[in-house]
């Protein structure tokens, strides 16, 4: 919008000898108005393996922010290293969060912490959003807690396990 106020599109079109219609920035202006009008806050925990490098989850962050623009909420992200979540720490770490998101990842590091986060979300009635690995984690947690398969896992993490639910 600042570039358009400086007539950049007119300059570019003129220099390139293009016949350009006037810019319609209605959608942009409406989005900015929605962003400015947000009145509530939502706290989302992202429980992952790469939380020290936020750019690893850039698309997840941007998706949450844009969802907030559309719903009138300022989204605050709490970065949670999966390996720090266990039955003793889950409440302290996740209590203030309005929702828990477990994104994708590879390898078995942090898997048990993610399972504890999914368990906390389910038992405390917190919204849980599992993306890729995060959805697999939800299935593993449910199989362990609700179906009684204490050793439920993914064949990716336990290739010879008796209860490979993924």
Predicted segment positions?
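N-terminal beta1-alpha1 cap of cysteine-dependent amidohydrolase-like domains
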Residues: 1-166
């Amino acid at each position: 919008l600042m570039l358009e106020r400086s007539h950049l599109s007119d300059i570019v079109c003129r220099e390139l000898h293009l016949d350009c219609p006037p810019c319609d920035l209605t959608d942009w202006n409406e989005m900015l108005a929605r962003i400015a009008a947000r009145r509530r806050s939502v706290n989302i925990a992202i429980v992952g393996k790469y939380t020290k490098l936020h750019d690893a989850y850039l698309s997840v962050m941007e998706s949450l922010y844009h969802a907030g623009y559309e719903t009138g909420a300022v989204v605050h992200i709490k970065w949670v290293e999966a390996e720090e979540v266990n039955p003793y720490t889950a409440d302290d770490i996740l209590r203030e969060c309005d929702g828990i998101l477990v994104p994708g990842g590879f390898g078995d590091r942090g898997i048990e912490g993610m399972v504890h986060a999914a368990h906390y979300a389910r038992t405390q009635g917190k919204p849980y959003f599992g993306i890729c690995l995060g959805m697999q984690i939800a299935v593993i947690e449910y199989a362990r807690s609700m179906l009684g398969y204490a050793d439920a896992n993914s064949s990716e993490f336990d290739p010879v396990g008796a209860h490979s639910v993924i």
